[in-house]
Curated annotation (Swiss-Prot):
GO MF term list: RNA binding; structural constituent of ribosome
Stretch forming the transit peptide: 1-19
GO cellular component terms, semicolon-separated: cytosolic large ribosomal subunit; mitochondrial inner membrane; mitochondrial large ribosomal subunit; mitochondrion
Gene3D superfamilies assigned: 3.30.1440.10
Species this protein is from: Saccharomyces cerevisiae (strain ATCC 204508 / S288c) (Baker's yeast)
Main location: mitochondrion
Stored Pfam families: Ribosomal_L5, Ribosomal_L5_C
Compartmental location: Mitochondrion
Protein name from the UniProt record: Large ribosomal subunit protein uL5m
Domain of life according to the entry: Eukaryota
Family of the protein in this entry: Belongs to the universal ribosomal protein uL5 family.
Alphabetically ordered keywords of this record: Mitochondrion, Ribonucleoprotein, Ribosomal protein, Transit peptide
Keyword Ribonucleoprotein among UniProt keywords: yes
């Protein structure tokens, strides 16, 4: 009986045929299209509703009440502001613009234009008040800077919690940008927080401020007429003692043994400061002093 043996030899040659991987000419899109696999199954149809649908378990009601501040502006203030700021035969007042070079010298070629006369930047044009550009509220920015946070950074976290308690919105931390040895300030330290309010959150904060907080401050004169950035922005501040008059803080004074003052910047669509002051006076903000 003959026996056969199979002997295998290792081949170290690189010329042997190897299978090549296929190359598709169609670009893949499976990583670009997001597929919710939970909706492909026929099970649990009650979980497939959109979160904006009231039948969805994840539905969150948002518009639970009317915006009294916005309704007051639309029903009363808007028409009054149009009448107060009306000027017969008013024309557009041109703001300061950049100036071109005379061209007498060859060095004037490709040179950037000169700054406006008497200003480092261009100023916008002032248009007459019409039905399309009546001054209105845009946003409220609250800034809380804690000087003691350079030694104890936990105070900056407390200031952020104070803003969140008062406004109901999540604040953003503020960090120092430079090193100032004389102030013992280091770059990158959290020094406070700020929050920007729009819509109903802004209306709720302004209503609480004008109806509850400011009337409880003793000998409160109001906002200075010198306040303003010349383009419809009004700024003022509240001390640490004034913050205790907010109902969110007053109801839990034991939880807030230390409060922090804050700066409030009200941004409006007014073109001049006196137009912004007229708008805010309609929301019961008092002003005092001489104008600029």
């Amino acid at each position: 009986m003959q026996r056969f043996s199979l002997v295998t030899h290792r081949s170290f040659s690189h010329s042997c045929v190897k299978p090549k991987s296929a190359c598709s000419l169609v670009k893949p899109v499976h990583h670009l299209v997001k597929i919710d696999k939970s909706k492909l199954s026929p099970r649990f149809p009650e979980l497939k509703y959109d979160k904006s649908d009231i039948r969805s378990p994840g539905f969150k009601p948002k518009d639970t009440h009317a915006d009294r501040l916005n309704d007051h502006y639309l029903n009363t203030l808007q028409s009054d502001l149009l009448l107060i700021n009306y000027s017969h035969n008013a024309a557009v007042v041109k703001g300061l613009k950049q100036r071109a070079w005379s061209g007498d010298s060859p060095y004037h070629l490709n040179r950037p234009p000169k700054n406006p006369r008497g200003s480092k930047a261009q100023l916008p044009d002032i248009h007459p008040i019409k039905w399309s550009n009546i001054p209105g509220l845009e946003s409220v920015v609250i800034n809380c800077f804690v000087r003691e946070a350079r030694e104890n950074q936990l105070l900056a976290i407390t200031a952020a919690l104070q803003l969140q308690q008062i406004t109901g919105c999540k604040p953003h931390p503020i960090f120092s940008k430079n090193d100032v040895p004389t102030w013992k300030l280091r770059k990158g330290h959290q020094m406070g927080a700020k929050v920007e309010l729009k819509g109903k959150e802004m209306s709720q904060f302004l209503s609480t401020l004008t109806e509850i907080v400011l009337p409880r401050i003793r000998e409160y004169k109001g906002i200075s007429n010198q306040s303003g950035n010349r383009f419809g922005g009004i700024s003022f501040g509240l001390t640490a003692e004034d913050i205790k008059f907010f109902p969110e803080i007053d109801a839990n004074q034991d939880s807030w043994p230390k409060t922090f003052g804050m700066h409030i910047n009200i941004n409006t669509s007014a073109q001049l400061d006196y137009q912004a002051r007229t708008l805010l006076s309609g929301f019961q903000f008092p002003f005092f002093g001489e104008e600029k």
